[in-house]
């Protein structure tokens, strides 16, 4: 029950904008501030690896609300040119409004474009192509990497920070196998509810995984695709962090989606759980959330590579 399926009857619905502007932080300003502190950390690692210099041109692919590109301008100064691209017109408008407020609009260009088609950008015209949580959701990653290669000058760099969700999907599949193979587990209502929630947010079998762009690849797959696109001097770091959840309240827990294509727990509960099931789920999970003992984990790939001169 991915968001794209839920909203299929609403042509005006923009799931990417809705996630970045609302569902990512459950509509909570305080939660958003905690999340953005983490986003800043990711963005700085991407920009550190990109080795931005004044006078360069940076392409922020899948720019969202423009955070990465604007961060680049703050670091490299008034001579950095940034090209913002996204498939969401609403997010591009949000990014442009931010640039206007920061008085840097003249340094910026905005294109509605997918990562696989950057035809608005000339061959060998940019110094850095950067992404943060964008390439992971691209269906044809080799085509996107080919476009990155095309627009980069000789000697220029790609720099990414991308989530790897494959293990989350495998965990859902493992939970499904346990339920199907163990009669006692199959009659455990709480385990079944957790499975139904997680399987609405992540694929639960091999076929679903293969067709889900955001979790059908590993860090090694991404490195291989970068090399096959012609890039050299590749460096990949997989960061796996387990930490106390940033979620501080029940409203934040049920309102937050773990990624743009996932429904929130509240959406799953309202559409798939009975009233009694909702009460059971909340009675067990809410105390753990409010005691702030819930642990989260993340797997982020940081990858840089160079187009040879």
Predicted feature locations:
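Conserved class I S-adenosyl-L-methionine
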Residues: 1-53, 67-75, 91-94, 98, 159-196, ...
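Short alpha-helix
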Residues: 215-229
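A short acidic, Gly/Pro-enriched loop at the edge of an enzyme's catalytic core
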Residues: 116-128
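Class I SAM-dependent methyltransferase SAM/SAH-binding core
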Residues: 57-61, 65-118
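C-terminal helical/coil "lid" or tail adjacent to the Rossmann-like core of SAM-dependent
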Residues: 2-30, 34, 233-291
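A short SAM/SAH-binding and catalytic strip from SAM-dependent methyltransferases
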Residues: 127-140, 164
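A short glycine-rich, Lys/Arg-flanked "PGG" loop and its adjoining helix->strand segment in the class I
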Residues: 142-157
């Amino acid at each position: 029950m991915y968001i794209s399926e839920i909203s299929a009857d609403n042509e005006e619905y923009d799931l990417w904008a809705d996630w970045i502007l609302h569902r990512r932080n459950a509509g909570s300003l305080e939660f958003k501030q905690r999340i953005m502190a983490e986003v800043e950390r990711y963005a700085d690692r991407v920009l550190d690896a990109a080795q931005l210099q004044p006078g360069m041109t940076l392409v922020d692919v899948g720019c969202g609300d423009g955070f990465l590109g604007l961060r680049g301008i703050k670091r490299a100064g008034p001579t950095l040119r940034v090209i913002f691209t996204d498939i969401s017109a609403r997010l591009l408008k949000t990014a442009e409004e931010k640039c206007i407020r920061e008085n840097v609009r003249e340094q910026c260009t905005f294109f509605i474009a997918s990562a696989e088609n950057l035809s608005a950008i000339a061959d060998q015209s940019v110094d850095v192509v950067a992404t943060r949580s964008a390439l992971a959701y691209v269906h044809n990653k080799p085509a996107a990497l080919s476009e990155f290669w095309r627009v980069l000058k000789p000697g220029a760099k790609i720099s990414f920070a991308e989530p790897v969700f494959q293990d989350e999907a495998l965990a859902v599949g493992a939970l499904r196998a346990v339920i199907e193979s163990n009669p006692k587990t199959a009659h455990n209502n709480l385990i079944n509810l957790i499975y139904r929630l997680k399987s609405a947010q992540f694929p639960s079998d091999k076929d679903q995984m293969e067709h889900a762009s955001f979790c059908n690849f590993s860090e090694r797959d991404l490195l291989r695709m970068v090399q096959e696109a012609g890039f050299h001097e590749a460096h990949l770091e997989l960061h796996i962090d387990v930490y106390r959840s940033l979620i501080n309240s029940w409203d934040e827990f049920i309102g937050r989606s773990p990624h743009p294509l996932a429904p929130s727990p509240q959406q799953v509960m309202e559409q798939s759980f009975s009233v009694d099931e909702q009460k059971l789920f909340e009675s067990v999970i809410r105390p753990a959330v409010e005691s702030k003992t819930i642990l989260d984990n993340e797997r982020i790939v940081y990858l840089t590579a160079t187009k040879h001169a």
